[in-house]
Amino acid sequence: MQFERFKLVDRILEINTAERTIRCEAIVPTESSILDHHFPGHPLMPGVLMLESMAQTSGWMILGVQGFRKMPFLAAAREAKFRTFVEPGTKLEMSAKMVHDGSGFALTQAQGTHDGKVVCDATITFRVVDFPKPEFKQQMLKFAEELHFPMQMVAND
């Protein structure tokens, strides 16, 4: 993870467009100015960043299902739960499943686990729209390659 770049997923482990699922790896940095202040002397990953990591994981899955034709933007998060503390250096496995896709919206169930135990989960809604600018899509494709996104899923429109 790179908090300062707002990159909260390190690597895509598996994406299955038929089942509309994804698994990603996210390693909490051992050093970050954010962790220096959350909390001083007892650094913990902020819950809002756990939620963002679940949202980014879901977003990559939606991009795969859409073949990078449309971009998901976070619209709502419901029933977000943070079940335990997440410390610097923790390796998280983030996962998501799309449970609805239609009318310009997608809904996912997402969670983060560590050593097989759920540390966070949420129901997340996205507005799914055309990319606002071609440059933005190109930047997202560049990020996708960095994360080992299976580029064969990108539609050749």
Locations of the language-model features?
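Catalytic strand-loop segment that frames the active site of acyl-thioester-processing enzymes
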Residues: 4-45
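A residue-level detector for short acidic-glycine micro-motifs
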Residues: 11-16, 79, 84, 98-100
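HotDog/MaoC-like acyl-thioester-processing domains
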Residues: 21, 88, 99-157
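Compact, glycine-rich, soluble single-domain proteins
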Residues: 39-46, 51-59, 74-75
